[in-house]
Amino acid sequence: MSNTQDSAVRRPSLAPEEYSVGWICAIPTELTAAMAMLDTLHGPLESQPKDDGNNYTLGSIGGHNVVIACLPRYGTNDAAVAGISMQRTFSNLRFGLMVGIGGGIPSADNDIRLGDIAVSLPSAQAGGVIQHDMGKKEDGGFRRTGFLNGPPTLLLTAIAKLRATRTLGKEIAEIVNEAFAEEDDEEWRFPEKEDDILFEDGNELDGNGAEGEHVVQRKERKSKNPTCFYGNISSGNSVIKSAKERRRLAEEEGVICVEMEAAGLMNFFNCMVIRGICDYADAHKHKKWQQYAAAVAAAYAKILLCIISPQALKPHRIVHFSVPFGQNSKFIGREEHLRQVLTALTPEEFERDCQRVAITGLGGVGKTRIALEAAFRIRDKHPDCSVFWISAVNVSSFDAGFLEICRQFKVPGINEDKADVKSLAKAYLSQETAGRWLLIIDSADDLDMLYKSVKESDGNGSSRSLAEYLPFSRKGSILFTTRNHKAATYQAGSNVVTVEEMIESDSLQLLETSLIEKGKGFIEDDAKKLVRHLTNLPLAIKQAAAFINQNKITISNYLEVYESSALSDQALIELLSIDFEDQGRYRSDQNPIISTWLISFLDIQKSNPLAARYLYIMSCVAQRGIPRCLLPPASKFDEIQAIGTLTAYAFITELEDQNSFDIHRLVQLAARNWLKTRGELFQRSGDALKQVSRIFPFFKHENRNICIAYLPHAQHVLTFQDFPEDSQESLRDLLHNIGEYYYRTGKYREAEEFYWRALELKKLALGEHHPDTIGSMNNLAVVYERHGEYAKAESLQRQTLELMKQVFGEGHPDTLGSMNNLALVYEQQGEYAEAEKLQQQTLELRKQALGEDHPSTLMSMNNLATIYEQQGEYAKAESLQRQTLELKQQTLGEDHPSTLASMNNLALVYEHQGEYAKAETLYQQTLKLRKQVLGESHPDTLQSMNNLAIVYRLQGKYIEAEGLQQQQQSQATLDEGRLSKPARKRRKKK
């Protein structure tokens, strides 16, 4: 063989897109003939798709790059598989050739002999190929169904030229003789004519003998050159051996040849069928003519290619689509986000620039899923646009992504030892010849990694940032996904699409579609509760669905587990830390929602330590309304940077007042768990305690709203219970101030708890004689008195008074305060003489020490007047209460709680003297102001309501009294935790 694979000129490998002709053979004999026709033999492909099972021979004929494949076995199915795989791997193929051997069907019009050539050509009956085993049996006959496509116009016009060539047969013979000129190539040359026997219909060869009297006598040809016939070729999976069937095909279908592969190709592979005749489609089968028949068919194909100008095969640019995940068939919602992304990404948006868009949002919110869906939609809408995906999780994955781009485009030089792959990829994509492309940079969170210059190992010691390798082309677009809003603005300017948690309806749909048993136990109310608990976060919902599927439970069952776990941080963390499989995430990713933010925590700790410190504190206080002043002081610039970092990761949200923040509930839980696993939670909770204690004020009438705003954070941080030694002073101060808040707002039971805790800690740390300890003893005794535990109050107050005398002296304001409080206890127990004596003594000492208009002095005046009233000395009581009220209005203001107490007490004196109209007016004023200042459910407000109702009854206004008492009872029911001191005893009139 003179022009075989062994002797043809060899060339290096070419890229798959450089091949324009596909050549398919059915058997090795046909492959040998095809290879003999190659002008040049090419090297094999550098790589081949894993789903392509073909084995290719590559070369060129007449300037065309040709790819040849041989089927593993006969049949239309194998031909179809081979053709599909070939077209996927070699995307620039313009047409194909099915070249090999077949069975000829001679007729009166077509004197077909062995060694002749049959070429598929459309006719009135068909497009050049029919499928003889595709049809229906009708009325004892057979009706073919279906229609196969014909050859492409380019080949038909070339065939027309060949048919006009008078010397075609001679040229074919010369090519065969030249290709198989070696001495051992005899079987490839023209066989003996006596082996060409055609039997009459119905008298085919039976066994190994021939029936000579039934042989068709044909005129001997003068030349051995093959003759070419054109018409329909019949193809199917069944072998034709019947003369009757052969005659039917010739007469009814115009068939000139039968074979077993072409029907599998015609409807999707633009090809022409060329067959060398090796038998007559009857029982007379032997292999003597197969080599020659294969050779002449291959020679015809070569001549055909040589008359088609290579320039007519204009190559089209190959389009690549390389993403790590399949399309999500259950993609839900996010249409507005996708619209924004797709609108901004198309080059038509601004043709003079490379479009850049960033998708940003909290980890687990679905950014990668949106980018993936965008990739598939762009492929569908713009099939000429290549799509590439790069994971920016680390430098290695970034480099691997650029290497894959180079491999896909067969960029020269990538296999060199010191190849700068990223520069090669950038240079290639930045050229207009690269065509349209979309580059997706996923997880572009680390600004340092992307924008900080690092020394490259390219031999020249240069330093470049990874971002400098991003290509620029007016035909290109880059889509980033990032958890970091700052990174998003770095990468895409104002073209940022912010993704938040799903709307509830989409969350419910995601939950339901993620379940295996979708209808089982799907109670919508429970489902709504669950997605709200999970903050409508897609990753958390997928995790919950995976747990439900794995354990074959219902949503209601999972909800019970979640809500019971929510009573304990650790139990909830364990539930939300259970791993699950997610085909739409990287294998290296942490799938559980509790783990997904760990990389972000580390990034923040590295890039902005102050932001990390803010996060630690926010993780230890209440989730909502975190005041800016709670955060450790820093310069304005540093504070803005730190807050900006946390908002950039969507961990916190700045509220409209710009002075407070909310932290995402699950992020807060994850941050606490992260601190715990690192052994830092104990110290960080102490830091948070210090900050809360620093800002939580000692209660005053003026700062009531501040205390209300800060109380949830104080309560939350105290749930940690154990704190470092350096936080103990802050703990004592905070307990004291919370107790004071509760006391001043009438929540005496709560006040007792916090006063008692503060007292116990102060005893341990400071000792019983320390002023702070004594102060806490006094506070606790006062609370006992307020909710009627007079014996305990008297005992503790006596201890307090003795200690104060020892430590401060008898004239000290704190000692006088204790004397006042003990007098109140005497009064409440009906010991008016002792109360009056002690209160008079206190009042005189306060006047001397503090002055007549000091609030403490006024308090003693009020208390003494009350004792007079309790003993029926109304004139003295009224005079002293009037004096007290006027001084309080001047010094404290008309709406101060102490002023309101004096108003109430003066009205009580009026009532006891029978001056009901004056009492009613003053009670009404007091009640109105107490509602405004203290709130409707404060014990003092309820006391005013009770007093006014009594005055109504005393005046016969029973309807007004009944209505007011119902209001009082409803307010008391709403706040059962409060226990006010009993209403003052009312002295009966004599």
Curated annotation (Swiss-Prot):
<feature type="repeat" description="TPR 2">
    <location>
        <begin position="774"/>
        <end position="807"/>
    </location>
</feature>
<feature type="repeat" description="TPR 4">
    <location>
        <begin position="858"/>
        <end position="891"/>
    </location>
</feature>
<feature type="region of interest" description="Purine nucleoside phosphorylase domain">
    <location>
        <begin position="22"/>
        <end position="304"/>
    </location>
</feature>
<feature type="compositionally biased region" description="Basic residues">
    <location>
        <begin position="981"/>
        <end position="990"/>
    </location>
</feature>
<dbReference type="Pfam" id="PF00931">
    <property type="entry name" value="NB-ARC"/>
</dbReference>
<dbReference type="InterPro" id="IPR002182">
    <property type="entry name" value="NB-ARC"/>
</dbReference>
<dbReference type="GO" id="GO:0009116">
    <property type="term" value="P:nucleoside metabolic process"/>
</dbReference>
<feature type="domain" description="NB-ARC">
    <location>
        <begin position="334"/>
        <end position="563"/>
    </location>
</feature>
<protein>
    <recommendedName>
        <fullName>Nucleotide-binding leucine-rich repeat (NLR)-like protein</fullName>
        <ecNumber>3.5.99.-</ecNumber>
    </recommendedName>
</protein>
<feature type="repeat" description="TPR 5">
    <location>
        <begin position="900"/>
        <end position="933"/>
    </location>
</feature>
<feature type="repeat" description="TPR 6">
    <location>
        <begin position="942"/>
        <end position="975"/>
    </location>
</feature>
<dbReference type="GO" id="GO:0043531">
    <property type="term" value="F:ADP binding"/>
</dbReference>
<dbReference type="InterPro" id="IPR019734">
    <property type="entry name" value="TPR_rpt"/>
</dbReference>
<feature type="repeat" description="TPR 3">
    <location>
        <begin position="816"/>
        <end position="849"/>
    </location>
</feature>
<dbReference type="InterPro" id="IPR011990">
    <property type="entry name" value="TPR-like_helical_dom_sf"/>
</dbReference>
<dbReference type="GO" id="GO:0016787">
    <property type="term" value="F:hydrolase activity"/>
</dbReference>
<comment type="function">
    <text>The N-terminal purine nucleoside phosphorylase (PNP) domain cleaves the N-glycosidic bond of ATP, and to a lesser extent dATP; has very weak activity on adenosine and deoxyadenosine and no activity on (d)ADP or (d)AMP.</text>
</comment>
<dbReference type="Pfam" id="PF13424">
    <property type="entry name" value="TPR_12"/>
</dbReference>
<keyword id="KW-0677">Repeat</keyword>
<keyword id="KW-0378">Hydrolase</keyword>
<keyword id="KW-0802">TPR repeat</keyword>
<dbReference type="InterPro" id="IPR053137">
    <property type="entry name" value="NLR-like"/>
</dbReference>
<dbReference type="InterPro" id="IPR035994">
    <property type="entry name" value="Nucleoside_phosphorylase_sf"/>
</dbReference>
<dbReference type="InterPro" id="IPR027417">
    <property type="entry name" value="P-loop_NTPase"/>
</dbReference>
<feature type="region of interest" description="Disordered">
    <location>
        <begin position="965"/>
        <end position="990"/>
    </location>
</feature>
<feature type="repeat" description="TPR 1">
    <location>
        <begin position="732"/>
        <end position="765"/>
    </location>
</feature>
